[in-house]
């Protein structure tokens, strides 16, 4: 839901607390996570890593709801790639904030995606891609005790945030879950 996609950025940036942030977003979706991060005024650069070339083409062709606003922002870049694969390898660069909104949940993954990202080992690898004081945020439509446990093994500070929203199509209140892990700052 777009409320929770925006909250993924907002809460992650609040948890970080810094400015001039370098942000990586795994998965473009409809662009709400990226746009919300840019709208805070605390982001210096934001890169979306999107595995589907069609989605990048839709963005470039103006078919994604926020295409025009994202494409005209000089801080924004989007490229084709596998965010999970990038985070599994050695870091070429370190980010202040990494926001992942790719799968429906750790247990309901899209396609044949390897689940290792959600494991302690996968999160340790992702942790290496964060600057000191950096934050990893993960979106899920369902609560995941196993993700919370793995994050508690890897990160110095973990925060789990439920985001409730009205689903008017089925006339129900639903809850999305946001998971945040913060890497210790040298000064803390």
Question: Which residues fall in each region the model found?
Answer:
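The AdoMet/dcAdoMet-binding core of the Class I SAM-like
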Residues: 2-132, 138-139, 144, 149, ...
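Core SAM-dependent methyltransferase catalytic element
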Residues: 153-188
